[in-house]
């Protein structure tokens, strides 16, 4: 009980410090508030998308090595509500974050980059991800459902990266950018899982739910996706 209270007190203290820093930053540099909220919202949403991808792949392939770790990626999508709040604040209260809300766009680009359609699409992405999380956390989640989730993630992840990030510079387009961002989401999720597993082992060395082999598998997966992300970054740079 004492340890739990100490942990909760530490979390509250860090949360209070973060809140003070956020408020100070918002007051001192108001022009940075929108971009910073967007960065935080996209990062939290990316953690959820990467975790959903990991879980869906495990179900589709019938992998058993990660069964005792499934709770971690199943809990990561809990960041989606906070991501939704942050992103909606940007879209509704700080539209100046996107230059196309000020500059008039013409043709199909003008239709696609209209605020109502943009907000509706973003809400659809977030809603589908929340639904996918509910479907994958069911005890009897089938490989067919997981395959459908992978298809949804591929389409919505590609569109979300284009809408939320690439449209910051509407004159610039790239066919590989969305893939690069999606792989970055997976890297973030696997890294969060690995850090959580290490934290569990440090706090409870006798815990058998996280084995050395599982840590090595997660580390190998993190290295592989990091190399892929770096390769895509280089391709994007070139």
Roles of regions detected by a PLM:
Residues 38, 57-58, 177, 216:
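Residue-level detector of alpha-helix boundaries and kinks
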Residues 30, 34-37, 42-49, 53, ...:
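Residue-level signal for well-ordered alpha-helical segments
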Residues 1-52:
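N-terminal regions that are enriched for targeting/export leaders
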Residues 4-16, 20-21, 115-238:
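Long, contiguous internal "core" modules enriched in hydrophobic/ aromatic residues
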Residues 2, 6-7, 29-32, 36, ...:
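Serine/threonine-rich low-complexity intrinsically disordered regions
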Residues 41-142:
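Transmembrane-helix bundle segments that line or gate the permeation/cavity pathway
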Residues 34-41, 69-71, 170-183:
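Non-cytosolic membrane-interface motifs at loop->transmembrane helix junctions
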């Amino acid at each position: 009980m004492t340890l739990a209270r100490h942990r909760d007190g530490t979390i509250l203290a860090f949360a209070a410090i973060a809140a003070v820093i956020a408020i100070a930053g918002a007051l001192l540099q108001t022009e940075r508030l929108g971009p910073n909220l967007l960065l935080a919202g996209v990062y939290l949403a990316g953690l959820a998308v990467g975790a959903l991808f990991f879980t869906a792949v495990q179900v589709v392939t019938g992998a058993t090595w990660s069964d005792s770790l499934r709770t971690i990626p199943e809990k990561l999508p809990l960041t989606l509500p906070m991501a939704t709040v942050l992103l909606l604040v940007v879209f509704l209260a700080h539209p100046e974050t996107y230059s196309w809300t000020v500059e008039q766009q013409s043709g199909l680009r003008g239709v696609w980059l209209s605020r109502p359609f943009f907000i509706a699409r973003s809400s659809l992405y977030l809603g589908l991800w929340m639904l996918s999380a509910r479907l994958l956390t069911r005890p009897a989640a089938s490989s067919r459902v997981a395959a459908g989730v992978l298809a949804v993630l591929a389409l919505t992840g590609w569109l979300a990266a284009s809408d939320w990030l690439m449209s910051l510079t509407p004159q610039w387009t790239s066919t590989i950018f969305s893939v690069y961002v999606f792989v970055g989401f997976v890297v973030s999720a696997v890294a969060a899982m690995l850090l959580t597993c290490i934290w569990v082992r440090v706090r409870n060395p006798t815990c058998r739910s996280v084995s050395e082999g599982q840590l090595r598998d997660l580390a190998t997966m993190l290295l592989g996706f990091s190399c892929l992300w770096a390769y895509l970054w280089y391709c994007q740079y070139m």
